[in-house]
Amino acid sequence: MEERILTQNFTQEDASEYSLRPRWLSEYIGQQKIKEELKIYIEAAKMRKEPLDHVLLYGPPGLGKTTLATVISNEMGVGIKITSGPAIEKSGDLAAILTNLQENDILFIDEIHRLNRSVEEILYPAMEDFELDIVIGKGPSARSIRLSLPRFTLIGATTRAALMTSPLRDRFGVINRLDYYSVEELKEIIKRSANILNIGIDEKAALEIAKRSRGTPRIANRLLKRVRDFAQVRGNGYIDFKTSKEALDVLGVDEIGLEYIDRKILVSIIEKFGGGPVGIDAIAASIGEDGDTIEDVYEPYLLQIGFLNRTPRGRVVTKLAYDYLKYPYIEQGRIEGV
């Protein structure tokens, strides 16, 4: 049971992605404030010979929440078990994981906001008292026993912290929001990844990829690999500025990182809904995309760069986006310039 919940089948691409992940805080680029805080918490926990307090990491996908969890386990010198909220279907699944933890181990739960509520309730005494309540038997003969657990650290990760229940969220002693990365930070990540993958790349090319990576390391590394493919097939394998620009144009990633679906979302709101406000379900239906995917993957970046606003009545495309897409701006029924 535990093996099914805790392991995945890794592809060669997954293995390559894993090799790019930093192992120590000193190697981790970006999120400076979080790194400084964690360094203090980790040192203090090690001095007291105690597990690190429970940690909640939240923010858009691809910013390094899982990577940061593995870095914390390395810095603490403890083991880590990785699972996700949807994978823990029953309370027995969680009980099996918790009882197999070693002293001071880290349990990392990705998408923790998707935990089943009955499973979540088992976590409360486990997080607070390192004890597990188990019901044995059914009906009138059922009885509850309490098992002692090894002291552990729970690291939860979520892209949607607002969907977590207050009782669960309040049990985390350390709560950190991961922010989008600067272009300069992404450039350094790309250069580091290129070095690990033995890819030749110049400064301007790394900067060009960084500009189109939506502030997200996962996207930066993905684009680097695809540009590498382009350089090997169309060039001599070395990534210069010209090669990077041509490859990214072929991939449909524009100068600020917008992709086909981003433009489709914005154009749909402008052409079909007068620029908004419009609900996420209507947007999803109009472009044939899942609403959760729009909210989790595409919308955060459009909000970040000021192309989209969220209002109580729905999503609204901003003047900035109209100008970028070269559409006449419509405000309160009036076309600007007319």
Swiss-Prot record:
Coiled-coil spans in chain: none
Annotated binding of Mg(2+), by residue: T66
Pfam family, one: AAA_lid_4
Entries under InterPro entries matching the protein: AAA+_ATPase (IPR003593), AAA_lid_4 (IPR041445), DNA_helicase_Holl-junc_RuvB (IPR004605), P-loop_NTPase (IPR027417), RuvB-like_N (IPR008824), RuvB_C (IPR008823), WH-like_DNA-bd_sf (IPR036388), WH_DNA-bd_sf (IPR036390)
Compartments reported by the entry: Cytoplasm
Chain intervals for the UniProt region annotation (Large ATPase domain (RuvB-L)): 1-181
Function: The RuvA-RuvB-RuvC complex processes Holliday junction (HJ) DNA during genetic recombination and DNA repair, while the RuvA-RuvB complex plays an important role in the rescue of blocked DNA replication forks via replication fork reversal (RFR). RuvA specifically binds to HJ cruciform DNA, conferring on it an open structure. The RuvB hexamer acts as an ATP-dependent pump, pulling dsDNA into and through the RuvAB complex. RuvB forms 2 homohexamers on either side of HJ DNA bound by 1 or 2 RuvA tetramers; 4 subunits per hexamer contact DNA at a time.
Annotated EC: 3.6.4.-
Self-association and partners: Homohexamer. Forms an RuvA(8)-RuvB(12)-Holliday junction (HJ) complex. HJ DNA is sandwiched between 2 RuvA tetramers; dsDNA enters through RuvA and exits via RuvB. An RuvB hexamer assembles on each DNA strand where it exits the tetramer. Each RuvB hexamer is contacted by two RuvA subunits (via domain III) on 2 adjacent RuvB subunits; this complex drives branch migration. In the full resolvosome a probable DNA-RuvA(4)-RuvB(12)-RuvC(2) complex forms which resolves the HJ.
Record-listed DNA binding positions: R310, R315
Keyword Protease on entry: no
Main location: cytoplasm
Annotated keywords: ATP-binding, Cytoplasm, DNA damage, DNA recombination, DNA repair, DNA-binding, Hydrolase, Nucleotide-binding
Domains: entry comment: Has 3 domains, the large (RuvB-L) and small ATPase (RuvB-S) domains and the C-terminal head (RuvB-H) domain. The head domain binds DNA, while the ATPase domains jointly bind ATP, ADP or are empty depending on the state of the subunit in the translocation cycle. During a single DNA translocation step the structure of each domain remains the same, but their relative positions change.
Segments for region (Head domain (RuvB-H)): 255-338
Family annotation (SUPFAM superfamilies): P-loop containing nucleoside triphosphate hydrolases, Winged helix' DNA-binding domain
Gene: ruvB
Swiss-Prot/TrEMBL GO biological process terms: DNA recombination; DNA repair
Gene Ontology cellular-component annotations: cytoplasm; Holliday junction resolvase complex
Official protein name in the record: Holliday junction branch migration complex subunit RuvB
Molecular-function GO term, any one: four-way junction DNA binding
Species for this entry: Thermoanaerobacter pseudethanolicus (strain ATCC 33223 / 39E) (Clostridium thermohydrosulfuricum)
Enzyme class: hydrolase
Reactions that this protein is recorded to catalyse: ATP + H2O = ADP + phosphate + H(+)
